[in-house]
Amino acid sequence: MGQKVNPVGLRIGVIRDWESKWYAGKDYADFLHEDLKIREFISKRLSDASVSKVEIERAANRVNITIHTAKPGMVIGKGGSEVEALRKALNSLTGKRVHINILEIKRADLDAQLVADNIARQLENRISFRRAQKQQIQRTMRAGAQGVKTMVSGRLGGADIARSEYYSEGTVPLHTLRADIDYATSEADTTYGKLGVKVWIYRGEVLPTKKKTEEGGK
């Protein structure tokens, strides 16, 4: 069932880590909803800053947030003004002390979330879904991917009946757990309704580090 399951969730504990890192007993539901609020708030506030993912860690009454973005300058702002305003807003939203880290994404064309968002924005600007997918696949392969697959679903070209069309290049081994596959979804709001975008990017295998064993008596 490797074709059906989310490739990121399948690899957690193998080559991937959790995006929310905390432990909770009876506060689990409250923390979970707080995480959802934080991610939704950051997504809306930094909608133009190419944010890929938000990692959240908790310790006592403190929340550490790591924002992965392709445009760190836009998130930080002049003299750190934007990130400080964001921190204050999150302080009031959560009622806790918030610390924000910014991590730059060096190659945006190898990040599935940024690629999916880019295709969705092109679809909203009335660019052909075929052209948008093919151009993005070429850019991703040139950036160093070993394989990429994209799929757009919905009323393509304003058709009465919704359908899905996908394009792929290279290999995307979904069953291989050591394969570093990034997966993301996005949505495009068009005049005919919503279009769904899915992206799979295969960035190569992640090999476990070999432990050096000393051989005695030689």
UniProtKB/Swiss-Prot annotation:
The biological process GO terms on file are: translation
Which keywords belong to this entry?
Ribonucleoprotein, Ribosomal protein, RNA-binding, rRNA-binding
Pfam name, any one: KH_2
Statement: the UniProt record of this protein carries the keyword Zinc? no
PROSITE patterns, A to Z: KH_TYPE_2 (PS50823), RIBOSOMAL_S3 (PS00548)
- KH type-2 domain residues are 38-106
Q: Which residues form a coiled coil?
A: none
InterPro entries per the record?
KH_dom, KH_dom-like_a/b, KH_dom_type_2, KH_sf_prok-type, Ribosomal_S3_C_sf, Ribosomal_uS3_bac-typ, Ribosomal_uS3_C, Ribosomal_uS3_CS
GO CC annotation terms, alphabetical: cytosolic small ribosomal subunit
Q: Name one GO molecular function term.
A: rRNA binding
* Entries under Gene3D superfamilies matching the protein: 3.30.300.20, Ribosomal protein S3, C-terminal domain (3.30.1140.32)
Q: What does this protein do?
A: Binds the lower part of the 30S subunit head. Binds mRNA in the 70S ribosome, positioning it for translation.
Q: Write out the similarity annotation.
A: Belongs to the universal ribosomal protein uS3 family.
Q: How does it assemble?
A: Part of the 30S ribosomal subunit. Forms a tight complex with proteins S10 and S14.
Q: What is the official name of this protein in its record?
A: Small ribosomal subunit protein uS3
Could you tell me which species this protein originates from? Bacillus velezensis (strain DSM 23117 / BGSC 10A6 / LMG 26770 / FZB42) (Bacillus amyloliquefaciens subsp. plantarum)
Upper lineage is: Bacteria, Bacillati, Bacillota, Bacilli, Bacillales
Gene name?
A: rpsC
